[in-house]
C-alpha cells in the first residue's frame, strides 16, 4: 500500500512541476510530452483557442498528444511486464538498509529456576516540567520515525530533484540569464509546497494511527499520559518535519547560488520567509489534518480527503464562494522585491493567517476531544466520549 501511495504522490509532484515548467514558451513541447495525464499535451494545441473554437472544434487527437500517450503506454507496459516476470507469491518482501544487521543467537540459561531481578527504585513525578519534558521526548521519537521512513525519503528526493530543475530553469527568462537572487531561489521552491503538504497529511494520519497499526494501542492507552501530550508530541513532530523540509529549500538555494558564483545569500530573508511566513501556512493545514485523521480510521483515506480539500477549496469560487474568509487557509499572499521588500502586503497576510490559525486551534481542541483512546465502536460512541471530555478549559478555548 505504501509503495502505491508513494508512486501516486510522485506522479502528482511531477504533474505539478510540469505545469509550472510548461509556462515558459520554450518548455511547452517537453512538458507536453512528459505529462503523465496528457493535460499538457492537449493544452499544447488548445491554449490559445477562442471560446468559439472551444465550442466547435474537436479534441485534437494528433501529433504531440499521440506521442505523449505512446510514451506513457510504453512506460506502463514496461513496468507491468517487469513486475509480471519478477513477481512470485512465495517471495519475501524486498527490504533495503544501509546498515547490516548482525544475527544474534539467544540461549536460554535459567532452566529449572527463577531468575531474581532487583528492580530499581523510582519516584513518580507528574509535574508540569515532567510533562513538557515527556512531550519533547515523544516528539523526537515520532520525528525520527518520520524522517527514517521510505515514503518520506522518496517524496523528499523527488521534490528536491524537481526543485533543482526549477532552479536551473528559473535562472533564464526567455533565454536571458539572470542573477540568482535569494528571492528568486525562494520562488523556485514553490513546487516543493505540494511535497510538504502531502508529507503533512500522510504522517499526521500515520502518527495518529501508529499505535493501532503496530497493535500496541491498548498498551499505550493504559498509560497515565494525558491526551494533550500524546497528540502534542505528534503535532510537534510534524512541525519539526515541516521546518526540516523548508530548510532544504534554503540549502538547495544556497548550493545553487554557490554553483553560479553568487555569494550574497541573504540568510535573514531565507529564514524570515521560510520559517516565519511559510511555516504558518503549513501549520494551519496540519491542525486540520489532525482533526480529519482522528475522525477517519484509515490514514490513507484521510490523506485522500485532505488532498481533495487542498485542491477543492480554491475551486469553490466556481460555486460562488469568492471571499477568502470562507475558504480555509486562503487569503492574500505576499511578494518580495529588491526595491521595496515585502511592501505593505504583509499586514493583510498576517491578519488572514491569524484568523485561520484560530480556527485551526479550534480543530485541534476538537481533535483532543475526539481522540480515540481505548476501544470504541464507531462515530456515535466518539461523540459520546467527546461530550464527556467537554469540561474544564475546553469550552473556554472553543468560545
Language model features: what each stretch is:
Residues 1-3, 9-32, 36-40, 167-172, ...:
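Secretory targeting signals
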Residues 4-86, 93-94, 262, 299-389, ...:
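Terminal transmembrane helical anchor/hairpin motif
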Residues 13, 126-135, 140-156, 160-176, ...:
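Catalytic cores of nucleotide-enabled group-transfer and carboxylate-activating enzymes in metabolic
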Residues 69, 73, 163, 191-194, ...:
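Residue-level hotspots within the lipid-embedded alpha helices of multi-pass solute transporters
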Residues 83, 200-204, 216, 284, ...:
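Hydrophobic/aromatic residues in alpha-helical transmembrane segments
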Residues 91, 110-158, 375-395:
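Aromatic- and glycine-rich beta-strand/loop motifs that create alpha-glucan
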Residues 176-189, 201-226:
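Transmembrane helix boundary and interhelical loop/hinge segments in multi-pass membrane proteins
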Residues 221-237:
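Amphipathic cytosolic juxtamembrane alpha-helices at the membrane-cytosol interface
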